[in-house]
């Protein structure tokens, strides 16, 4: 009798529904798939094995579209865990598809990254996706205040990545990776 692992179960469940949001997020949140994404899309992991990335460098369990603590409130919930919802009284709420932390390999100091993976069905949603990606990165940076840094200790800000996977790109954009950095 064959036993399916969690990746195989998620692939089976998604079968003809892979474009459905929840199924797609569950598939992308698998640590092995995340490890492949990190290996191919980030400089920090390009020389690492996929197994090492999944087992040694991805921290904890990647969070999938879960609610969080309101970032403007002080409470015992304001900890090192990564939530997928970023709320601000003045800026509204952003819900990240998948969000997790990772450690940079082969560094003297333990350097942490905050990584967001977005599954995007519509390649042309009526606004520039790049601007939305920049906005998400900006929110991930600003939300670190009072969690990873306070006052003027900007040296403690963690590097962020927002990686967007377009599930239905136009023919000319299929099998491509576009990178933007600021």
Segments from the language model and where they lie:
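Accessory alpha/beta interaction modules
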Residues: 1-182
